Amino acid sequence: MRVTYLMRCLAMMRGGGETQHLAWIRALAKLGVEIDVITGRPLLGHAVYPPEPDIETTTLRSPYAREFVYRTQSWRGFGRLTMWSLHGDEELFCRLAFNRIAARPQQPDLVLAHALHQAPRLAPGTYPVAVYLPGPPHTRYIPDLQRADALISDGYAAKQLPAMIGRHVDDVLKGVDIDTFTPDGPNERAVQGLEGKKVVICVTRLVPIKNLPMMLKAVALVRQRQPNVVLALIGEGPQKPLLEQQARELGVADAVRFVGYLSQSSTPSWYRSADVFALSSDFDNSPNVVLEAMACGLPVVATDVGGLREYVNPPAHGVLTPKGDADAFAAALLDYLNDEDRARATGRDNRHAAVTRFSWAVSAARMRDVYARVIDEFARKRSAPREVAS
């Protein structure tokens, strides 16, 4: 079985979607599935992230509008412009990707398009196309998605999307590498000068939907009662200058560490340095980072949005607060920072849940079965005799 993944942003940013697909690709390879990736970089400039050495990757030059969208989507009057910019960028990337596939001597058995909703409409029809949906699409894409050979999602989104799109969505839960993400091992406290600090860690892209301004407000409130608090922000994104300015205005610039992007192999030591994991998103389907934090034995404080309850069952695994409520978020953080016994007990429960409920091997086997079914259905559909009109 050979599958080609279309991942528009893999060379330019690394968020939860990109990370989870890389994990799936590696787990599927162990099951004998051959996978290559087509991604894009800007017309001018270079890719931010080089190809993964163990994954066959093709990088196409095309406009890259996502940075523009992130920077301007909250500007008054720019909503329609940003939507059309992103649509045009993704549409062109899909066309270029399908042209590149057509030029290959061997065609894939299946193409998986990550959040590229127009791909089924643009595909040549000589192989099946599945679309992975990390969350609800814009309604304009529903006709395109109804043409897909399969739709795949997980958790909350997989439960909500069938009613919206009007067709079946395969639910393939994510996993976590419990051997890499573990409470045991080196941490960064001594190296980073965090000894004696109360460390809150957030691993995320610095983009508007993550509502990091609310988290900074919460940290400012926490600091009033816990002066040793430090927030470690792991990730990159266009909102970094805005967040740095806000931290200065709130008087917490010295309590916020902008660590930047870290590879998965470098992230566990930071999780082990923390007392609590925090996520302030306005929406998240089922973020990988929550599973990583749980596997590392951390309690979780997050906003009660999307599919967070798929992983976090309060109070056993953490606290979920109302979206945008900095006071409630700060109170939940303080409960763990000021009660080490409670934090450790919750962390133990989270590690147990990660080990017993989530596994990339199980998840990849489920994904392989979905691919095999879609390929078989497509082949039978193409070989079925067609009725001739009289």
Where are the predicted features?
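A conserved mid-protein helix/loop that constitutes part of the nucleotide-sugar donor-binding site
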Residues: 19, 23, 198-224, 231-233, ...
